[in-house]
Amino acid sequence: MRNWLLPEYIEDVLPRDAYRIEKIRRLIMDMLFAHGYQFVMPPLLEYVESLLAGSGSGMNLRMFKVVDQLSGRMMGLRADMTPQAARIDAHLLNISGVTRLCYASSVVHTVPDEITRTREPFQVGAELYGHSGIESDLEIQCLLLECLSVSGIHSIHLDLGHIRVFRSLIRDSGIKPEFEMELYAALWAKDISSLKELVRTGLNKRLTRSVQNALLLLPELYGDGTVLLSARQHLPDFPEIGEALDQLEHVARILQPYVDRITFDLADLRGYHYHTGMVFAVYTPGCPAPIALGGRYDEIGKSFGRARPATGFSLDLKQLSQLTDMNGYPSGILAPWKPEDEKLAAMVRQLRAEGHIVVTELPGEENQEVTGCDRKLVFRNGNWEIDPVTG
């Protein structure tokens, strides 16, 4: 057996990539701290019921599970830190006002993402609790755009949706949960033939003609700002739909100067099991999958005894690091081994304080290649100076 082999889609991150990931993590966390988001560190393992709170069956399939040898209960390795942050807000902090939390750590999935091809993403996210207005949705989305900007992502396509459009269409229909899930699956996949069949056979006795037509129209409501105009013209005049469209229009108007492109997708039901309002995804050239996801999820705290308005975003730092133009591990300065030389020690301390990498060459390494150093300290005319490494 080759003991150095890793499981499929689990990988070591080597120095150059690890440095880039860590550099971006620090930039993003500094941005989150500057906006008042407080860092939390939830545990890697929790009881399954807690990790699945308000998340639906999809999360259950993505989660590794183990039996707790102390209690006999089933535990899970987190696949998403959002429910953990919600638990902390609802049960541990128990603050009545607005709470801003952020996190950054690894999560694990039973199967790899189709695009990133890893089962161990490094998730960074921010969550805002206790405010139900569109202003908090805007704060989260503006914050995400700033985090992407400091990470070196400058070409951004923002895609907006709103769960309440679909929910308002079926809210009073009295359809069975299994039909609702079939509808959701057809809309999410934009499977027009299945959607037509569902509306024609399984749902036509429950839905009015205007709602049937609206459901069939939803997959076509994708594109630029004309989508909202078409939605106002053809969707039922439900107050909740009108409010959702107003919110989308308002957010798009404010964020338009900061992104390259904004589109709308009224059939985007990603996270339907827990999202309750506006949802969004961010794309960038060179990656067909979203590089960040987020939205409003006002009911998730109910599972922990305290429902709170909430909105947030998350991204995979490993994926993000592959899309930036940031350089890998920086070159260093090679210093000789002279522990008794006070001038040398002072200069090394100064260089390190200025942010330079200084590597001390250990005895016996003089004739070996030292990777990562393109300069060296040399003693000249009574002073230590920096010279380029030649040869």
UniProtKB/Swiss-Prot annotation:
GO biological process: L-histidine biosynthetic process
Keywords for the protein's UniProt record, in alphabetical order: Amino-acid biosynthesis, Cytoplasm, Histidine biosynthesis
Predominant location: cytoplasm
Domain of life: Bacteria
Regions crossing the membrane: none
Pathway as given in its UniProt record: Amino-acid biosynthesis; L-histidine biosynthesis; L-histidine from 5-phospho-alpha-D-ribose 1-diphosphate: step 1/9
One GO cellular component term: cytoplasm
Cellular localization per UniProt: Cytoplasm
Amino-acid biosynthesis listed as a keyword: yes
SUPFAM superfamilies the record matches: Class II aaRS and biotin synthetases (SSF55681)
Subunit structure: Heteromultimer composed of HisG and HisZ subunits.
UniProt-recorded name of the protein: ATP phosphoribosyltransferase regulatory subunit
Name of the gene: hisZ
